[in-house]
């Protein structure tokens, strides 16, 4: 808030603060009880994951991007996993190539999405824990972004062992 106030004074214009994102980093993974089966997504899953990504972007109001290319690329790299319960996909999560930052390897978990009809069953926790292990397995510190105003996702990530390390806010001038 201090930075936003200073920008308003400097520019002499009001600034509209938009929804923020919280940045979490994993301390110690606390694995949830398992249910169902987790598998890496394949090209055969493209349509479903593409639809879920569109839904994810609508719900989270993140900036739009080339969803088709991103989904195809991440499926090809083996970066997207599906959770299936009784053979039906119920949730997915992805991760990104780790990057070197200040001498440390940092890997980002996300996106994580469970359609509304499958929520409140622990599926997001389970798929997030699985993908987190993939990031850690690459020798990276696991991080993720979540909406500041979404208490459910924040609670899930904290229960898995993620701790808040920073916050980003988007602004409009």
Describe every region a protein language model picked out:
Residues 29-63:
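Short amphipathic alpha-helix that is part of the acyltransferase structural core
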Residues 1-35:
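Acyl-donor-binding surface of acyltransferase catalytic domains
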Residues 19-23, 78, 166-169:
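Short hydrophobic/aromatic beta-strand or adjacent loop that forms the aromatic wall/cage
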Residues 11-18, 158-167:
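Conserved acetyl-CoA-binding loop of GNAT-fold acetyltransferases
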Residues 63, 69-113:
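A conserved beta-strand-loop-helix scaffold within acyl/acetyltransferase catalytic domains
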Residues 1-3, 143-154, 158, 170-173:
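Conserved beta-strand-loop-alpha-helix junction that forms the acyl-donor binding cleft
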Residues 111-116, 120-137, 154-159:
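Conserved acetyl-CoA-binding loop-helix of GNAT-fold acetyltransferases
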Residues 78, 139-141:
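Short, high-confidence coil segments that cap the C-terminus of an alpha-helix
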């Amino acid at each position: 808030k201090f930075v936003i106030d200073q920008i308003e004074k400097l520019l002499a214009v009001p600034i509209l603060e938009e929804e923020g994102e919280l940045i979490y980093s994993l301390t110690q993974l606390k694995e949830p009880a398992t249910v169902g089966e987790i598998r890496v997504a394949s090209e055969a899953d493209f349509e479903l994951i593409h639809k879920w990504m569109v839904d994810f972007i609508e719900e989270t109001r993140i900036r739009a991007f080339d969803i088709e290319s991103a989904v195809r690329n991440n499926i090809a790299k083996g970066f997207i996993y599906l959770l299936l319960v009784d053979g039906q996909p119920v949730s997915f999560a992805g991760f990104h190539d780790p990057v070197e930052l200040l001498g440390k390897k940092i890997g980002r978990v996300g996106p994580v999405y469970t359609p509304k009809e499958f929520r409140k069953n622990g599926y997001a926790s389970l798929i997030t824990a699985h993908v987190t292990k993939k990031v850690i397995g690459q020798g990276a510190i696991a991080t993720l972004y979540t909406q500041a105003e979404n208490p459910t996702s924040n609670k899930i990530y904290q229960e898995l062992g993620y701790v808040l390390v920073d916050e980003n806010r988007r602004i409009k001038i």
